[in-house]
Every structure is written in C-alpha cells, then in structure tokens.
Amino acid sequence: LKSMDLHEYGKLQHQLAVDLDRNINIQWQKHAYPLIASFTYSVKEIEYMARVIDRTGGGKNTVVVISLGQHFRPFPIDVFIRRALNVHKAIQRLLMRSPDTMVIIKTENIREMHSDAERLSDFHGYIQNLVMMDIFQDLNVSIIDAWDITIAYGTNNVHPPQYVVGNQINIFLNYIC
C-alpha cells in the first residue's frame, strides 16, 4: 500500500492508502462533531458518517467499518442515540442499493479511569455499547467487540497497546477474508 498525501492540516487528517495493482483503496476519516481532541485539526473536512455512507457505492469488494463511542461520552445519551440511528438508516440505504457490501461495527475500547472520570468513564461507554448493540441488531453487519477485548486484556487505555489492536485487526481480517 502506498500512502497518499492529501495536503490536509492537522493530526486528524483524512488518510488514504492505495495499491493500484491489487485494486485496494483504504480510507480513514474523522467523524463530525462531537470531536474531542487536545490538538488542532481542520474543520473544513468534517462530515457526518451518514453522509459519507450515503456517498459510498458499495459492492462485493467494499468493506465499511464504523466506530462510534468515545467522543460522545461527555454528552447526553440522546446525542449518541440520534447519531447511531442516523448511521443505522444510512447503512440500511447502503445495503438496499448494494446488498453485497460488508459493514463492520467496531465497538469502543474501555479507557483509563484517572482522566475526567465523571464525564468520560466506562459507565457512559457501557450504556453506549448496549444502545449500539440494540440499534444495529436488525442489520446484516459484523461486530468487532473491542469492548470485550479490551476488558479481557485489562488495558484500561482508550488507545490500547499494539498487541490488543492487532487482535482487533485479526478479527477484521477474519471477516473480510
């Protein structure tokens, strides 16, 4: 894969890697608000996930991976529910126009308990995790249960160590291969 420079500003810039010989195109982009970060980032590229999904053509060689969670913790649960429902509807539309598209939902990681526990604790994450499982249960999507994986490893880190992320990636690869 060759990483492409998209000439965007900040740490959370859109990422693109391609392999033209194998027809592989991997993209990553930050989600829209709420977006909590301790560094600067450009707001001009921010898009809601539902809009990005609606623009995705889909097909048997297309995999869409979505993760909702951490940045919603400090906000009322209805903000998270509304966003998850909008993503659910967008996935429904994607699967109607292109049923061979694979959609994978990655749950959030547990996190450390010493950083602003009142607003960011796993209590809020657990509720969001339950809500997400309920909202997406009727769709033909696969789940990477990062919540259970990070509990099993006892990492207590919003950005778990490489070996934990590696196991999450292995589950992803098992779904698509």
Question: Where does each model-flagged region fall?
Answer:
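Extracellular glycan-modifying ectodomains
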Residues: L1-C177
